[in-house]
Amino acid sequence: MLELLSKEVLQRRVFNPYYYDLHVKEFMLGQTKDHIDSEGTVLDIGAAVGQYSKFFAINSGHVYAYEAVPPVYEQLCKIKNDHLNFSAYNIAISDKVGKDKFYVDGQRLSNSSFQNLVDGFPIDVEVSTIDKQHENANNICFIKIDTEGTELDVLNGAKKTIDKHDPHLMIEIYPKFNKYPVDTTFKFCFDRGYTCFYNHRGRGLKPVKDIEHGVKIALTMPEITDGDFLFLNGNRA
């Protein structure tokens, strides 16, 4: 089925300097710089074509990026041309290890997921966990997760890594696609002592007081937050 994707669809998922600059200036991405260790490791889960990976590579010691859809992964690998501190993997990250069905958004390639969100077509993908992939890693300082509704599965497969490294987290929480109740991701992070912020476009970071407040922001302000939340770990300087 992948070979049937049109050139028009494939062209929609290429690195775009305009959108890169926009996300650095106005979205959560630009707010992450102060929370990335210049010598640390960043994990980009659901990396797409690498617009966030590029920013992380500029500001960290090394980036490990994961993208499940092969033609999107091919675009992601081009980041390596400019950033030697970058590694890409054609693996879907979740809470298990093995093989599974993954649904490709054949119209835009942007809403591909373990969930069939947009009448996609299935492909078989390799699946792993953050804990498995990075059990021997040093100084994982930041993890970004954008997996179209399965972010909690990624977190559940990263518990050992989170406990060991105390990374800051950037997580998409988009109720329309969430596999689980909206409060569950907030609870996972708040239970581990994280403080939470959203990016009010044009105004900067604003605090999320508690789980209930986070759910309200996620449900009512997606156009302002772009669905992204920043969770800061107080144990990391």
What are these regions (language model features)?
Residues M1-A237:
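Phosphate/nucleotide-binding beta-alpha loop and adjacent structural elements of enzyme active sites
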